[in-house]
Amino acid sequence: MKYEFGAEKPEQFRQYWPGQYDFFSYMEYACAIPQPLFAITTRKADGKPTSTSTPGAAFRGDKGGFFAILAGLCQHTHTYENLRRDGAFCVNFLSKRYYDALIRTVEHNGPAEDEFAVGGFIEETARTVAVPRIAERFLTLECKCERIEDLSGEGLTAMVIGRVATWRWPRIMRKASRIKNIRGTVFSISFTRLRI
């Protein structure tokens, strides 16, 4: 059986929490487009590290640079405030074993909470931006904000485009040249001419 839906939310999609379909399109739940597991890290105004997930991202570039495009970042969050204030973030790719830890950081993200401690993550100093990296990641993109735009014009979510200033992964991965399964995450890498 095949299903086809339009832009309007069908009746059968019930709301699980207040405002669910204000902040997220019903299509994000219906389409279930797979995404790699990653955490966006920033710093709160008081200097505490933050870690959060975002509904989706794309990573693209051309000869003018490589970019992390975060779509659907809620504008009422401290992560959004941090990005606007500091203009920087890290994208930390994590293996599936860190899923529960990442969810804990989302559930316990009050102003006074150290989200790295809540998730059990080790804070690592980034090389080119003044926000932390997660030591447990297998790949980090250190990004400087290029643009922040209201996604729908409703003042609810934003699209953030960050220029990747530095990327880093563990030494063990530097010899990869074909599809690998690294700590539970499958992706393709090819370094035929790159010397690291």
What are these regions (language model features)?
Residues 1-196:
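Basic, polyanion-binding surface patches
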